[in-house]
Amino acid sequence: MDPTDAIREIVERESRAYETYDADLMLTVFHPDIVWAWPPHSRAYDPMEWVLRMGRFNRERWRAYLQKFFDDYEIVHNTRTIRKIVISAEGDGAFAVVDIDTLWRRRDGSAEMPNTGRACKIYALMPDGWKMMHQPGTMTYPAGA
């Protein structure tokens, strides 16, 4: 598969995992060395504000975390638009710029959690395909960015 098509597929697979509440499918996206640092809000450009949501990838721990999230929240809408895909000259690294507009609602109706903005998803080519190395959150950039 062409690398650009492969990156598009993994972005779409991640979205499909959210929409179907499929923790196992979501786990297929992650690189074994991913660590998930995350901004607490969409304008936290300064990493001094960020939190560490998940330590180094551990399949069982991450699966339990995702399954709990999927059990507690339902997706109201999920629109993701790929704006740019860049493949390294060596063909073994890539990133995708994705505009995200996702709204989650607690299944008990008590709260909503919007995830809106632009993400840069960073990938490495592994023997079993492309895997996400990092995504530093979904940020809202100034107009015209």
Which functions belong to the PLM regions below?
Residues 95, 111-145:
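Short beta-strand edge/turn micro-motifs at domain boundaries
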Residues 4-5, 23-90, 113:
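A solvent-exposed, acidic/Ser-Thr-rich amphipathic alpha-helical stretch
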Residues 33, 98-105:
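Generic short beta-strand segments
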Residues 14, 20-22:
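Short helix-adjacent coil turns
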Residues 80-86, 100-102, 117-124, 137:
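Hydrophobic/aromatic beta-strand elements that line small-molecule binding cavities or substrate pockets
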Residues 103-113:
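Short, cysteine-centered beta-strand-loop-beta hairpins and adjacent loop/turn segments enriched
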